[in-house]
A protein has these predicted regions:
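Short, cationic-aromatic polyanion-contact patches
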Residues: 64-72
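Positively charged, polyanion-binding regions of nucleic-acid-associated proteins
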Residues: 1-22, 47-51
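The alpha-helix within a helix-turn-helix
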Residues: 25
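Short, positively charged loop/turn segments that connect secondary-structure elements
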Residues: 19, 29-49, 54-58
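Short beta-strand "wing" residues that participate in macromolecule-binding interfaces
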Residues: 61
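Short loop/turn and capping residues at structural boundaries
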Residues: 22, 39, 64-65
């Protein structure tokens, strides 16, 4: 799964809960949404994906490293 899609899915499942990027990464890996053996620099990709999603307005950035699914 694409890292952006994985981040959106994890944040969507969290509902109104604000998650740190490390929690998003952990949940994506635990749910096997991202394969760390076939994806290079998983950590960097998740951080960059979350930043890009926030810039696109698809997720809300709540603070340094904190993200939440966009309401509505």
């Amino acid at each position: 799964m694409d890292p952006k899609e994985a981040c959106l899915l994890v944040l969507g499942e969290a509902g109104d809960e604000t998650l740190h990027w490390t929690v998003v990464l952990d949940r994506a890996l635990t749910q096997r949404l991202i394969d760390p053996f076939t994806t290079r620099d998983v950590r960097g990709l998740v951080v960059k994906s979350l930043a890009a999603l926030a810039k696109e307005g698809r997720v809300d950035k709540q603070g340094t490293g904190l993200y939440r699914a966009r309401a509505g």
